[in-house]
């Protein structure tokens, strides 16, 4: 059987958790292939609202085995706090499986993340301060600590001491902070060893064997395309590859086994943190989208920057991810606003760009070129089929589909699991 990958098509917070929750009940495994506890999901099940950070949204699907893949960086304290919080509400979160090759976020990663952001001041990237970037940096520098390392105390101690030889020089001499004792870090990791042990698996083997047996695997990407370290608005990006290609790398599932690439995209656009945002609104409509859409970051609590739909970004995301389908979310937020602007191209210093500009400098100077469509006034939160939507809402969806270069198979008309219109069920393609 083949695999499905879910990818955010904008700057995150598109509603990937809802998509995973809906499809997660139809698959055997739900895998988070990248990121850490810096990417939040909000899932509404049975009227209950769940805010997830490190765990995949599939943790709430009883039929699926949730997996943290090798591309994830794991903060063990955050992991077990999240598990305990879910189980206190009746969820069976202890069935989680974790790749032995996933990297761990150490206390010194978090310290360095916060110190470096303060040091940069106005030049700060706007990270969550959770140590994700420094953990990925150590992974690439080959001085990272993996899940498997905490089961061999001598290796763990050696790796921690080697890492702190470098980190303490930075903390003391560059940032005027106290050195971190290696033993404190070792004890921190060892305190979670026994609880972690039954969860650890050779994920690459188990997932590929599951596919060989005809089972379904869903990969739930964190963050989004425009935050990808290679394809996003660098340097205002995350430290991993939350695109379809990154899902293959971060799970150990080969790219030829992925048959459906499902992009999650809002009916408008949002962004958290610093960085260019061509359609950003600074007027009453920005406040309206923020308030009506509930645009507050799950992880940071920061208000999201809001703007109109950007089809240039959508086309770019379609291209770099090879999207086969789109899941459009929050269509209901646009009800009753009169006219809806859609960005169809950019103007950069008097030149029209229908696709992404070549350089980030040009993107920073991009001004949106809009076309407008009439909004609808009818309540759409109870619509179950595309035909039940008002004609103006149908027209808007079809125009986004045309501009984005990919069919829109799912439409979110409210936060609930059942408030989703299915035009095409991607599970039928498997």
Swiss-Prot record:
4Fe-4S as UniProt keyword: no
InterPro entries per UniProt: Adenylosuccin_syn_GTP-bd, Adenylosuccin_syn_Lys_AS, Adenylosuccinate_synth_dom1, Adenylosuccinate_synth_dom2, Adenylosuccinate_synth_dom3, Adenylosuccinate_synthetase, P-loop_NTPase
Binding site for substrate: 298-304
SUPFAM superfamilies: P-loop containing nucleoside triphosphate hydrolases (SSF52540)
Enzyme nomenclature, EC number: 6.3.4.4
Highest taxon of source: Bacteria
The entry's keywords: Cytoplasm, GTP-binding, Ligase, Magnesium, Metal-binding, Nucleotide-binding, Purine biosynthesis
Root EC class: ligase
PROSITE patterns for the chain: ADENYLOSUCCIN_SYN_1, ADENYLOSUCCIN_SYN_2
Residues engaged in binding Mg(2+): 13, 40
Position of the signal peptide: none
GO cellular component labels: cytoplasm
Annotated catalysed reactions: IMP + L-aspartate + GTP = N(6)-(1,2-dicarboxyethyl)-AMP + GDP + phosphate + 2 H(+)
Chain positions recorded as IMP binding sites: 13-16, 38-41, 128, 142, 223, 238, 302
Cofactor note: Binds 1 Mg(2+) ion per subunit.
Major localization listed first in the record, in broad terms: cytoplasm
Keyword Metal-binding: yes
Pathway of action: Purine metabolism; AMP biosynthesis via de novo pathway; AMP from IMP: step 1/2
Assembly, per entry: Homodimer.
Family statement drawn from the similarity comment of this UniProt entry: Belongs to the adenylosuccinate synthetase family.
Main function: Plays an important role in the de novo pathway of purine nucleotide biosynthesis. Catalyzes the first committed step in the biosynthesis of AMP from IMP.
NCBIfam families: PRK01117.1, purA
UniProt protein name: Adenylosuccinate synthetase
Organism this protein belongs to: Corynebacterium aurimucosum (strain ATCC 700975 / DSM 44827 / CIP 107346 / CN-1)
